[in-house]
From Swiss-Prot:
Cofactor(s) this protein requires: Ca(2+); chloride
Key words, A-Z: Calcium, Carbohydrate metabolism, Chloride, Disulfide bond, Glycosidase, Hydrolase, Metal-binding, Pyrrolidone carboxylic acid, Secreted, Signal
Any matching Pfam family: Alpha-amylase
Residues annotated as binding Ca(2+): 118, 169, 178, 212
Residue numbers bearing the Pyrrolidone carboxylic acid modification: 21
Compartments in which it is found: Secreted
Protein name (database record): Alpha-amylase-related protein
Enzyme Commission (EC) number: 3.2.1.1
Cystine residue pairs: 48-104, 157-171, 376-382, 418-441, 448-460
Group of enzyme by EC: hydrolase
Organism of provenance: Drosophila serrata
Annotated site, Transition state stabilizer, chain positions: 310
Signal sequence extent: 1-20
Alphabetized GO MF terms: alpha-amylase activity; metal ion binding
Length: 494
């Protein structure tokens, strides 16, 4: 009986721990993470204070923080080739990182770090020098900055069969030296690295290449981490939020279900299907059942996104900033529909897969600059600063904890729906106008369409809609309108 009680206690403790790792630890009614891809720490700190917090964003995913290899031309992916756990990268040093985390936490913006637990850097001719000046010999699996030696890695082999679990989890992903996470020593180094970031005030981690590590090894590592730092405003006993990169198209030998109890999982099917729909390859009317009926994970387990830093560079259905009208519509739907833990992308311009972030002649990352409307220039795209996107972050906050109802569609690519009696969204992806009296479910009054304008001093700078006592309003979205979406909510009542 004592053994049974102990086993039950341990089981319940494990279940409680994994549930806690699904909690993003957001402030108040905030809901949305933004990935400020390749931004410098000092620029993120300022963005938290001057833009993200005032507009209700919840958190920032930052690029990898630990020292990486220096690759010719400085492609973005060099950040994913670590050679030590020193906190010095092109984004800044440890002092600048700690300052950024503190300043962002102080204004209610949580920081989530993209972490590399699967591997170290790939082969490099001779001695490699990292962003903190550390030397390594990747071809010999020698990384003195940790230190790691060959005994800390799986034997070298190539992934040639993606249906072979051994190859997927113990061979080298695109030649990157594959760490042995079953080793007590390797585990201790990874836990030490993550705990240091927790001490500095981060709220959690995006775990890169999670499917290439055995779930039982990750369970041990996650379970060994410290609680979040109460000095940064986290409650006592709060656990780090974990979201794991697991690419699973539904026929993978290593499946997302092996990881979704440990933390959230990146729902790549969401990205692919929303791209197909808003590119016109699937009618929007079918989105009424969006979510688990489409084979997606449970809402609380799914980290959702229109695109990410990887798949935005691929050919195919995934939308990116280069199709702005469809991208804004897809993002509006993403943030209005009650499914998933939402993340939006903030990119830099690229012409090919390897394009580096905007940099000067000395290959230093440059700070984003803004025009008079606050939109980024000088090579940064900053989708999160597009009015149609940051306004929908405000919409998502306004309608939090409300149900979707009042769905309408024209049998094709015009749709609308309500969120409780607090918000209304309409989308037109047809080649003809949407002009219709629709039920907005809102209290009577005049509302500002937050995608076309802003409510300033009681006046709307864009479209406005008058809602009658029955909740109906006349909705017009022209086929050639700049935006194919219209959004109303109670916090934008004129």
């Amino acid at each position: 009986m004592i053994k049974f009680a102990l086993a039950l206690t341990l089981c319940l403790a494990g279940a409680s721990l994994s549930l806690a790792q699904h909690n993003p630890q957001w402030w108040g009614n905030r809901n949305t993470i933004v990935h400020l891809f390749e931004w410098k720490w000092s620029d993120i700190a300022e963005e938290c204070e001057t833009f993200l917090a005032p507009r209700g964003f919840a958190g920032v995913q930052v690029s990898p923080v630990n020292e990486n290899i220096i690759s010719s031309g400085r492609p973005w992916w060099e950040r994913y080739q670590p050679i030590s756990y020193k906190l010095t990268t092109r984004s800044g040093n440890e002092e600048e990182f700690a300052d950024m985390v503190r300043r962002c936490n102080d204004v209610g913006i949580r920081i989530y770090v993209d972490v590399l637990l699967n591997h170290m850097s790939g082969d490099f001719d001779g001695v490699a020098v990292g962003t903190a000046g550390t030397e390594a010999e990747p071809s010999k699996k020698s990384f003195p900055g940790v230190p790691y030696t060959a005994q800390d890695f799986h034997p070298s082999c190539e992934i040639t069969d993606w249906n072979d679990r051994f190859q997927v989890q113990e061979c080298e992903l695109v030649g990157l030296k594959d760490l042995n996470q079953h080793s007590d020593y390797v585990r201790s180094k990874l836990i030490e690295f993550l705990d240091h970031l927790i001490e500095l005030g981060v709220a959690g981690f995006r775990v890169d290449a999670a499917k290439h590590m055995a779930s039982e090894d990750l369970e041990y590592i996650y379970g060994s981490l410290s609680n979040l730092n109460i000095d940064h405003g986290f409650p006592h006993n709060a656990r780090p939020f974990i979201f794991q990169e697991v690419i699973d198209h539904g026929h993978e030998t290593v499946s997302r279900e092996e990881y979704n109890e440990l933390g959230a999982v990146t729902e790549f099917r969401f990205s692919e299907e929303i791209g197909k729909a808003f590119r016109g390859n699937n009618a929007l009317k079918w989105l009424q059942s969006w979510g688990t009926d489409w084979g997606f994970l449970k809402s609380e387990q799914a980290l959702t996104f229109v695109d990410n830093h990887d798949n935005q560079r691929d050919q195919g259905a995934v939308l990116n900033y280069k199709s702005p009208r469809q991208y804004k519509m897809a993002t509006a739907f993403h943030l209005a529909y009650p499914y998933g833990i939402s993340r939006v992308m903030s990119s830099f311009a690229f012409d090919d897969h390897d394009t580096p972030p905007p940099q000067d002649a000395q290959e230093n990352i440059i700070s984003p600059e803004f025009d008079e409307d606050g939109v980024c220039v000088n090579g940064w795209i900053c989708e999160h600063r597009w009015r149609q996107i940051y306004a929908m972050v405000g919409f998502k906050n306004a309608v939090r904890d409300t149900e979707l109802h009042g769905w309408w569609d024209n049998g094709d690519n015009q749709i609308s729906f309500c969120r409780g009696n607090k918000g209304f969204l309409a989308v037109n992806n047809n080649l003809y106008d949407l002009s219709q009296e629709l039920n907005t479910c809102l209290p009577a009054g005049e509302y500002c369409d937050v995608t076309s304008g802003s409510l300033i001093d009681g006046a709307c700078t864009g479209k406005s809609v008058t809602v009658n006592e029955h909740g109906y309003g006349y909705i017009h979205i022209g086929s050639d309108d700049f935006d194919g979406v219209l959004a109303l909510h109670v916090n934008a009542k004129v």
